[in-house]
């Protein structure tokens, strides 16, 4: 029957479009939530184990090697929670940020894998013995599923994050491509206007990056919190440099940028970690109560420095 088709007759042949549309939002909810929940469980399990397990008459949590792993777990778990909150807030506002959800899916599942590996290292022999007392093994076995589904992570990093992001986020690039393929009489005039704007935009990016490179103290910061201001300045300086590298890559490679997967992936990494740093800053400013900031500060500093 026709009413078995989602949306009825007018949606015949649009199944793939509907699926991709749902994927863009869905991968920003389920898999990032799985990544951060995995990290939270691993953090709790590893820290409790480090407190009760003894070696040479001392709790293993007193050894610096274990402390280093626990600090890494704690900082990355904070960063994941900050990214989860920022991403879902955007989705809750009705936005469909497909590039942002790709960033969240890739980096939060990878961070979840890193955290779980560190927790397994801490629990050592206990972590590799299956049974009801093993709180990590089932998550360790299931983690490759999160890495694979809704866009395998290799594909997401190499093709989707920057390959799609540069087209969607550039203020003029998409309009320029549309004008090139347009058959309207005024398409040439429109293209010339967009080209002038693009050149002006790239020139402004280059001058801004040069100014911040030579005079780094001129970087702006809006936060009232002194511990946040230096990170805001670092984000502004790095974003200016990324804009120049992205423009230069587009100028040299053009449409072949997607085929230069290693370059696209590295540029995507920079963009992704800038997003992670902004998420960490926003979470610390807006979600952490003033009375709790002193306790949260070590997590915030570790997570933001890791992202930058």
PLM regions: where:
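Flavin-dependent oxidoreductase catalytic core characteristic
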Residues: 1-308
């Amino acid at each position: 029957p026709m009413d078995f088709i989602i949306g009825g007759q007018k949606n015949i042949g649009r199944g793939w479009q509907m699926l991709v549309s749902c994927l863009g939002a869905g991968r920003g909810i389920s898999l990032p939530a799985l990544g951060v929940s995995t990290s939270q469980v691993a953090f709790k399990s590893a820290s409790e184990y480090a407190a009760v397990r003894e070696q040479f008459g001392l709790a293993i949590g007193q050894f610096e090697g274990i402390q280093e792993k626990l600090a890494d777990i704690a900082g990355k778990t904070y960063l994941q929670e900050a990214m989860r909150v920022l991403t879902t807030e955007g989705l809750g506002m009705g936005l469909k940020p497909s590039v942002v959800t790709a960033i969240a899916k890739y980096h939060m599942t990878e961070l979840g894998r890193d955290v779980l590996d560190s927790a397994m290292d801490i629990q050592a022999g206990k972590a590799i013995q299956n049974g009801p007392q093993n709180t990590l093994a089932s998550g360790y076995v299931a983690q490759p599923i999160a890495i694979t589904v809704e866009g395998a992570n290799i594909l997401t990093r190499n093709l989707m994050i920057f390959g799609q992001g540069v087209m969607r986020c550039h203020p003029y690039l998409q309009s320029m491509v549309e004008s090139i393929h347009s058959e309207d009489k005024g398409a040439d005039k429109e293209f010339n206007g967009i080209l002038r704007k693009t050149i002006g935009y790239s020139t402004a990016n280059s001058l801004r990056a040069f100014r911040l490179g030579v005079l780094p103290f001129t970087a702006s910061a809006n936060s009232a919190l002194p511990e946040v201001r230096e990170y805001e300045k670092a984000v502004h300086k790095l974003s200016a440099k990324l804009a120049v590298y992205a423009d230069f890559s587009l100028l040299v490679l053009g449409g072949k940028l997607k085929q230069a997967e290693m370059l696209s992936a590295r540029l995507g990494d920079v963009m992704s970690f800038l997003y992670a740093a902004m998420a960490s800053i926003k979470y610390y400013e807006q979600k952490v109560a003033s009375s709790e900031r002193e306790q949260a500060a070590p997590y915030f500093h570790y997570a933001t420095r890791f992202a930058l």
